């Protein structure tokens, strides 16, 4: 019964993502029910086979946040930077998804993990997320810890460069949101359909 309930939650999350990203509803719903044939915007993982995600970082309050905080509820994880316009748009899409899920009484924790911890300190993350949704959790930490976690999620990203045309920094990266189970295991990842640069 619990597995059926979790499966229904996942389907509803998938549908909410589809509504926000503009993917055809029926195709996504069909894909959700047949994960072995899933081809549109997401990849699935067998929860029993997936290892638990392990990390220890620092949140926007300057407190330790480790992987045990992912247990007991569903989580959506997004990697990016505070200075990227595209990441700002992506997080606002995630915020829209959360609003849809709340109407279905589905509680999902959102975790934003910076790919530039040298710039995105706890203080920077706190100010940034207050403008989007102060219920979101922002994580930073040592460069090597971020690199190891990004590697666990297979996140692609490049070194930060300064764009003289825009007078801003840019860091190119893959643009996925990751769904984590209440056991702290990877379930699916979804493409938000935004440009990868930023």
UniProtKB/Swiss-Prot annotation:
Pfam families: SCO1-SenC. Gene3D superfamilies: Glutaredoxin. PANTHER family: ELECTRON TRANSPORT PROTIN SCO1/SENC FAMILY MEMBER, LINALOOL DEHYDRATASE_ISOMERASE DOMAIN-CONTAINING PROTEIN. CDD domains: SCO. This is SCO2-like protein RF_0043. SUPFAM superfamilies: Thioredoxin-like. Belongs to the SCO1/2 family.
């Amino acid at each position: 019964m619990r597995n059926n309930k979790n499966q229904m939650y996942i389907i509803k999350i998938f549908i909410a993502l589809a509504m926000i990203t503009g993917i055809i509803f029926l195709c996504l719903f069909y894909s959700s029910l047949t994960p072995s044939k899933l081809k549109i915007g997401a990849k699935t993982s067998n929860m029993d086979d997936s290892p638990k995600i392990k990390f220890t970082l620092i949140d926007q309050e300057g407190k330790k946040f480790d992987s045990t905080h992912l247990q007991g509820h569903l989580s959506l994880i997004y990697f990016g930077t505070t200075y990227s316009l595209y990441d700002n748009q992506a997080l606002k899409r995630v915020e829209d998804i959360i609003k849809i899920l709340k109407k279905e009484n589905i509680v999902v924790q959102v975790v934003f993990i910076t790919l530039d911890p040298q710039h995105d300190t706890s203080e920077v993350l706190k100010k940034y997320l207050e403008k989007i949704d102060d219920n979101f959790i922002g994580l930073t930490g040592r460069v090597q810890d971020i690199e190891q976690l990004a590697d666990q999620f297979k996140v692609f990203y490049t070194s930060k460069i300064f764009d003289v045309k825009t007078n801003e920094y840019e860091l190119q990266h893959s643009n996925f949101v990751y769904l984590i189970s209440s056991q702290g295991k990877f379930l699916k990842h979804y493409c938000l359909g935004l440009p990868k640069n930023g």
